[in-house]
Amino acid sequence: MGGISIWQLLIIVAIVVLLFGTKKLRTLGSDLGESVKGFKKAMAEEPKDAEFKSLDKAENTAQTKKEEKEKEQA
C-alpha cells in the first residue's frame, strides 16, 4: 500500500520523457556521469597530495631543528 509499484514508476518515467525529451535527458545523464567521474578522480588524488604535504612539513621541521642545534653549538 505504501510502496511504489513498477507501473507507477513507468508512468513517472513516461511523463519525465514527455516533459524534457530524450535529447535533454541524454545530455543530463552524460553531464552527471562526467561529474561523478571528476569527483572520483579528485577524491583519489587528494590523499596523495595530503601525504606529500605532511612529508614536506616533516622535512621542514627536521631541517629547522637541525639549524637551531647548529646555531646553539656555534
From Swiss-Prot:
It is a single-pass membrane protein. Residues 45-74 are annotated as: Disordered. Pfam families: TatA_B_E. GO terms for biological process: protein transport by the Tat complex. It is found in: Cell inner membrane. One of its GO terms (cellular component) is TAT protein transport complex. GO terms for molecular function: protein transmembrane transporter activity. Signal peptide: none annotated. The chain crosses the membrane at residues 1-21. The Tat system comprises two distinct complexes: a TatABC complex, containing multiple copies of TatA, TatB and TatC subunits, and a separate TatA complex, containing only TatA subunits. Substrates initially bind to the TatABC complex, which probably triggers association of the separate TatA complex to form the active translocon. Belongs to the TatA/E family. Part of the twin-arginine translocation (Tat) system that transports large folded proteins containing a characteristic twin-arginine motif in their signal peptide across membranes. TatA could form the protein-conducting channel of the Tat system. This is Sec-independent protein translocase protein TatA. It comes from Actinobacillus succinogenes (strain ATCC 55618 / DSM 22257 / CCUG 43843 / 130Z). The gene is tatA.
